[in-house]
């Protein structure tokens, strides 16, 4: 049975979370797009996935994840270090965990952080941080991995986030695969598999057609031979 992954992108719409240097771009819209791409990647890798409805409050999202029997609860957010319109100075991913270092949450969050840092281009070390106040961390009985992907109030980070929505989704998927010990299937590999399946189906159809023609011809020859006796 497939593991169940529940995705919860930022629920607050504009004007929450403006992206520095990108007028009209907001955290909600970006994380919803990343969540949809992550869902597609996870399904490609064999996982069952649900994405929270954009309008659902946190309580409803957590309740839905619990009722569904989610194995892994994945909020998707981008970060901010300033509450003003000035550019923030902080950069880089961080992942929020509950419990002590070495526990299940911390280890899963470390996997997500390590995967993000394989993609992120700058040398930062925000790491995994303990959080016991966020609702989607302290009210989720299943494993919760809470990435803050980068800082949307920093120009360089905002650019990186917008230029890498697809790669970020693949990175989050790789982290899930690493946690559960399953194979990550890259998009190209999946496409090649689908192409191979289509090619095989076409060859099998040709084979069946030629076999049918052979049987018909054999019957005609047999009938002709019988008529000549």
Where are the predicted features?
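A short, glycine/acidic-enriched catalytic loop
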Residues: 14-26, 80-111
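Acidic, proline-/serine-/threonine-rich low-complexity intrinsically disordered repeat tracts
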Residues: 187-197
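Long, well-ordered alpha-helical scaffolding segments within enzyme catalytic domains
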Residues: 33-44, 102-121, 158-186
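Active-site histidine-acidic residue metal-binding/catalytic motifs
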Residues: 1-62, 68, 89-91
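Active-site-adjacent mobile loop/cap segments within catalytic or ligand-binding domains
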Residues: 3-8, 12, 17, 68, ...
């Amino acid at each position: 049975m497939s593991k169940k992954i529940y995705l919860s992108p930022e629920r607050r719409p504009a004007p929450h979370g403006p992206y520095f240097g990108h007028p009209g771009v907001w955290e909600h819209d970006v994380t919803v797009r990343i969540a949809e791409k992550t869902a597609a990647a996870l399904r490609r890798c064999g996982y069952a996935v649900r994405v929270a409805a954009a309008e659902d409050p946190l309580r409803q999202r957590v309740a839905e994840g619990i009722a569904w029997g989610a194995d892994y609860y994945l909020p998707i957010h981008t970060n901010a270090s300033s509450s003003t319109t000035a550019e923030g100075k902080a950069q880089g991913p961080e992942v929020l965990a509950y419990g002590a270092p070495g526990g299940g949450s911390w280890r899963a969050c470390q996997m997500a952080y390590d995967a993000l840092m394989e993609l992120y281009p700058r040398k930062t070390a925000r790491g995994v941080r303990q959080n016991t106040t966020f609702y989607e961390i302290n009210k989720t009985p299943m494993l919760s991995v809470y990435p803050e992907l980068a800082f949307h109030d920093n120009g360089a980070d905002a650019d990186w986030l917008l230029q890498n929505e697809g790669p970020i989704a693949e990175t989050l998927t790789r982290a899930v695969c690493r946690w559960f010990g399953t194979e990550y299937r890259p998009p190209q590999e999946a496409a090649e598999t689908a192409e191979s399946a289509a090619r095989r189906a076409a060859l099998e159809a040709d084979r069946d057609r030629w076999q049918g023609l052979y049987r018909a011809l054999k019957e005609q020859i047999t009938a002709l031979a019988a008529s000549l006796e």
